[in-house]
UniProtKB/Swiss-Prot annotation:
Belongs to the periplasmic pilus chaperone family. The gene is sefB. It is found in: Periplasm. Disulfide bonds join C124-C155. This is Chaperone protein SefB.
Amino acid sequence: MYILNKFIRRTVIFFFFCYLPIASSESKKIEQPLLTQKYYGLRLGTTRVIYKEDAPSTSFWIMNEKEYPILVQTQVYNDDKSSKAPFIVTPPILKVESNARTRLKVIPTSNLFNKNEESLYWLCVKGVPPLNDNESNNKNNITTNLNVNVVTNSCIKLIYRPKTIDLTTMEIADKLKLERKGNSIVIKNPTSSYVNIANIKSGNLSFNIPNGYIEPFGYAQLPGGVHSKITLTILDDNGAEIIRDY
């Protein structure tokens, strides 16, 4: 009996130490997760959307250039980018398949717009992961997958344009006025349209104005040290550049 018990103890100890390296090896596999990143961003077909008074709607397209589907949520905000605007986008939520393009429609929900000048809103498109987008673990290697989903929210300008406005961007650019105010220069917009300015150059200086635009009948004050001659890069409705020297 003594010999039998001694044999059993030795056998148990032998199998215990044989198992330890295996357990340690499995632990190392679990401690090294696979990191998978997915970016839920979309390509928008324009930099701004123009809604003309009395039109039933306007539209724009979006494209999913990723290799996986993306859920899309849309919302229109007022100029403050927080309160809801009198527009809806249809469909407000949709699934865009991989490498697919679709068109969204913007519809007004009110007619209480300023009839004398343009109004600015923000059209925001957010890409989010589908609810069932869960990666399964590799059970054979006992490997843990760490999925990181990067959600993006792209906002572009939505401009309401009354019927009374018929000036082209070139005509608006010709109407801008420059006035010196102390040691700085003020750019005045005497029109009822928004003026989108991508860049300003003066001598060796190059800079932008706050928000990138001048509102109707508004102005932008340039920093001190700017020369009397400046060059503006103005964007039209399609995002094309118009260069003007003043």
